Design a protein with these regions (language model features):
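Surface-exposed cleft-lining segments at the edges of enzyme active sites
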Residues: 74-79, 102-104, 135, 147-166, ...
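Catalytic His-Asp segment of secreted/periplasmic serine-dependent ester chemistry enzymes
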Residues: 185-245
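Short hydrophobic segments within beta-strands
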Residues: 71, 131, 182-183
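Serine-esterase "nucleophile elbow" of acetyl-processing enzymes
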Residues: 47-105, 110, 118, 230, ...
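A conserved mid-domain beta-alpha-beta active-site/ligand-binding segment of alpha/beta enzyme cores
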Residues: 138-177, 182-191
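N-terminal secretory targeting modules
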Residues: 1-69, 122-126, 132-155, 191-192, ...
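Short catalytic/ligand-binding loop motif for oxyanion handling, primarily in non-cytosolic enzymes
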Residues: 77-80, 108-110, 135-141, 188-194
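Short, well-structured alpha-helical segments in soluble
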Residues: 113-124
Length: 245
């Protein structure tokens, strides 16, 4: 990582997963999965290998000038999926361009926006692809905590959650400079039927602001854990991102 040697990367390290190697993770295990029959019948081999910064990705290349950056939560990490079938890897294959995955299990909109800001401020990338998380995920402002420990309890009735998501999207748009940013969202990111009208309001705002985005597809399949999406849905995301580039 020649280019990054002059940049302090401590801010973005996920301490708990630095160089971790495991075949199960979180709810992607027999003990914690959503459907044990599905888990046992899943035939694809899965390994979780994290790089020296704590992300499920290869180590950064020597030159990152032309790299595409992917930011998201556990769906972008690819929980329950083989690494090569995650949407960032599918985009990499389609574009024949290195995609660097900067995603965290449980990431909030604020965390995603902070990562985008760090990348823009330090690397001035050509392209960032974002998959925003659940509306109701919020982050503890206490920056002394590890990122993995900053998730706040979910309150589905907190009307400020939607405003928080919108504010973070607009923050990224306001600082992107020449970077092309494409936004999308995890399936059912609104996390409840009562938020469906808000999603429509959000899409209208993005359209009015000429922001590059696409609505999330319906989840067409499930990964080994019985919760996250698998190859059919990740392929839909990958195609949609590439089509907007």
């Amino acid at each position: 990582m020649v280019q990054s040697k002059l940049i302090n990367l401590d801010e973005i390290i996920l301490t708990r997963t630095v160089n971790e190697f495991t075949t199960t993770l979180g709810i992607d295990s027999f003990a914690h999965c959503q459907d044990r029959d599905h888990y046992n019948s899943y035939t694809k081999f899965i390994v979780y290998k994290f790089n020296e910064l704590g992300y499920r990705d290869e180590e950064w290349p020597e030159n990152i000038d032309n790299c595409v950056w992917a930011i998201g939560d556990s769906f972008t990490v690819g929980i329950g999926q083989p690494f090569e079938e995650t949407w960032p890897q599918l985009v990499q294959t389609k574009l024949q361009t290195r995609v660097i995955n900067i995603s965290m299990n449980g990431a909030s909109a604020t965390w995603i926006a902070r990562r985008a800001k760090f990348i823009i401020d330090n690397f001035n990338p050509k392209t960032i692809l974002i998959q925003w998380s659940y509306v109701h995920r919020r982050e503890d402002p206490d920056a002394s905590k590890l990122d993995e420990d900053r998730a706040l309890p979910v309150d589905p009735l907190d009307v400020a959650d939607f405003e928080n998501l919108t504010a973070n999207i607009m923050l990224v748009e306001s600082i992107k400079l020449s970077t092309v940013v494409i936004h999308s969202f995890i399936p059912k990111f609104f996390d409840g039927e009562n938020d469906l009208p808000k999603a429509t309001v959000l899409y209208n705002m993005l359209d009015t602001s000429n922001i590059l985005y696409f609505p999330p597809p319906d989840q067409a399949d499930v990964a080994r854990d019985g919760y996250h999406y698998d190859i059919l849905t990740s392929t839909h995301y990958a195609n949609s991102y590439v089509n907007l580039l």
